[in-house]
């Protein structure tokens, strides 16, 4: 079940590979995420000292958050992957043009997971081409619906 999606990532990047990573969260963050108070739109993933971090993910604290905890909505959160996966990602990200982007936040067996994608940036003309394809598919489906309706009425 998806909690939050980063639709902008699919618009701005070609996603080549996807990985599911665990995320290190505090208690108030888990409660806020369960209430769907999370946003991945401006988030990105970086690699530092052999570890992977999610930056810019906005988790809005609940009004009933504890008074002795200072909630930081946009703090850096560590992502959990196997060391072999991290080594593989480091090798691919160091090549020119590749980056890591968060695609989706979801539950897996009661745990909150983040799906990250190994992505290559799209040029402006690629974005326009993707938009044209999407519009054509939408138009095709509406034409087919009209055609089927007219055939059924005959």
From Swiss-Prot:
Compartment(s) where it occurs, according to its Swiss-Prot or TrEMBL record: Cytoplasm
GO cellular component annotations of the record: cytosol
Record's keyword terms, sorted: Cytoplasm, RNA-binding
Gene3D superfamilies, per database record: 2.40.280.10
The organism's place on the tree of life at top rank: Bacteria
Residues making up the signal peptide according to the UniProt record: none
GO biological process: trans-translation
Gene Ontology MF, one: RNA binding
One Pfam entry name: SmpB
SUPFAM superfamilies per UniProt: Small protein B (SmpB) (SSF74982)
UniProt xrefs under HAMAP family: SmpB (MF_00023)
Function: Required for rescue of stalled ribosomes mediated by trans-translation. Binds to transfer-messenger RNA (tmRNA), required for stable association of tmRNA with ribosomes. tmRNA and SmpB together mimic tRNA shape, replacing the anticodon stem-loop with SmpB. tmRNA is encoded by the ssrA gene; the 2 termini fold to resemble tRNA(Ala) and it encodes a 'tag peptide', a short internal open reading frame. During trans-translation Ala-aminoacylated tmRNA acts like a tRNA, entering the A-site of stalled ribosomes, displacing the stalled mRNA.
Family statement: Belongs to the SmpB family.
Name of the protein in its database record: SsrA-binding protein
Lineage: Bacteria, Pseudomonadati, Pseudomonadota, Betaproteobacteria, Nitrosomonadales
């Amino acid at each position: 079940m998806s909690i939050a999606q980063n639709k902008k990532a699919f618009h701005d990047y070609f996603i080549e590979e996807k990985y599911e990573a665990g995320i290190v969260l505090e208690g108030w963050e888990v409660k806020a995420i369960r209430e769907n108070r999370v946003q991945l739109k401006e988030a990105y993933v970086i690699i530092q000292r052999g570890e992977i971090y999610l930056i810019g993910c906005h988790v809005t604290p609940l009004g009933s958050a504890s008074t002795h905890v200072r909630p930081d909505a946009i703090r850096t959160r560590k992502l959990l992957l196997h060391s072999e996966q991290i080594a593989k990602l480091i090798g691919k990200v160091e090549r020119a043009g590749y980056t890591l982007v968060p695609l989706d936040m979801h539950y897996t067996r009661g745990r909150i997971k983040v799906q990250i994608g190994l992505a290559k940036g799209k040029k402006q003309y690629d974005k326009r081409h993707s938009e044209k394809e999407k519009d054509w598919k939408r138009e095709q489906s509406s034409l087919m619906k009209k055609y089927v309706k007219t055939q059924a009425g005959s």
